[in-house]
Amino acid sequence: MFSKIKGTHDLMLDKMVCWQKVENHIRTLFAKYHLQEIRTPIIEYRGVFDRAAQHSEMVSKETYTFTDKKGRFITLRPEGTAGVIRSYVENKLDKTSQLHKFFYYGPFFRYERPQKGRYRQFHQVGVEILGQSSPFLDVEVIFLAYKTLKSLGICDITVKINSLGCKTTYNNYLQVFKNYLQTHYQQLCPLCQERFEKNILRIWDCKNCNNEPFLKQAPRIFDHLVEDAKVRFLQVLEGLKQMNVNFELCHDLVRGLDYYTNSVFEIVYNNEQGHQAVLGGGGCYDNLVTLFRGSPSPGIGFALGMERLMSILATRSFCNKNILPSLDAFILVSEPQFFYQGLELATTLRHQGFSADLNYKFLSFSKSLKQALKKQPLYLLILGPKEFANNQITIKNTYTQQQTTILQKDVVSYLQNNKELNYIHEN
């Protein structure tokens, strides 16, 4: 027997129903923001991710990369932004003056240590908006990420936010920070000594060094923002207040990818035990399109991790409230010679927008009934010898236990007038 690969998981049955419900909810919400879905390949040339985040540990240590039959390096996508930018430039959308608002959803891959809420194949839903840079756009994008979680009933969340400033601020601060840490180099853990040379801002993320006094006393990037960047960031903070977003200024927030500029943020969930889990994050990337040899085109985006999101929702009313079953009707055919009449009826119901199923084995009535009820239909439609002879069908509501016999030609109108089914189709 084969088992699934470590760090992956199967989605099926009730879990799949809950996932689909959440996916549909998010799609409906994003449509109201006039976001268009974009689907990029799961595989890209390795250079796509090298170009976007050459010095990030995700690219250097966590990607699944292999060579194809022509010796080219292919990578399973570890994140969504790089593929969207590659597509944006390749399709010459950077040459237009339009604001492009995209969302994506799908699987991603990183080779990291599996643990609760973290997998090697995982799912993200993300938003990328390209073509403009504005503090007001920052506010709406952050608010959308916040609103998405709140609309799912996850209210105990906080937006942690910082600014990395413009390119000038970023470069100046890197030198200031490096000069400061030079005198504390021996106090850095081995990983942070490596980061010191390649991606120094990631030292702020280190769990080993983060509580050390020398890092708490380190220069903050906020204090080195040029005036325009500081004014811009203060406008973002004011906008979040206006939108009643629960946020916290976090000076050590830098995010894991090195293409971010200006506003960066994470959304953390505060559970009942007082622990925090990052549900998603994002920020601005004013220079990323030019790294892909596109025309200057600023952008902002975010991604939410579905596995962590679903682990919270699994215990919430969004997935657990008592909803009516998704199967409208099960047609119980008692004899093989009645099967095609039952199949025609099922086809008619499906054509009219109802979900319908029927049996393919013909057991005793009691056994067939037991099998049918396992499908949890709202209505059981029984086609036996008497019904077959008179072009009738016996309909039983599996919740109220009410039963009636009507002509087969009246089944559709009967179901269309049913309040329970109207509830299902409206929700």
UniProtKB/Swiss-Prot annotation:
GO molecular function: ATP binding; histidine-tRNA ligase activity
Catalytic activity: tRNA(His) + L-histidine + ATP = L-histidyl-tRNA(His) + AMP + diphosphate + H(+)
EC number: 6.1.1.21
Signal sequence coordinates: none
Biological processes annotated in GO: histidyl-tRNA aminoacylation
A GO CC annotation given for this chain: cytoplasm
Compartments reported by the entry: Cytoplasm
UniProt entry keywords in alphabetical sequence: Aminoacyl-tRNA synthetase, ATP-binding, Cytoplasm, Ligase, Nucleotide-binding, Protein biosynthesis
Main location: cytoplasm
One Pfam family this sequence matches: HGTP_anticodon
SUBUNIT field: Homodimer.
Protein family per UniProt: Belongs to the class-II aminoacyl-tRNA synthetase family.
UniProt cross-references to NCBIfam families, sorted A to Z: hisS
Protein name: Histidine--tRNA ligase
Organism: Aster yellows witches'-broom phytoplasma (strain AYWB)
Gene: hisS
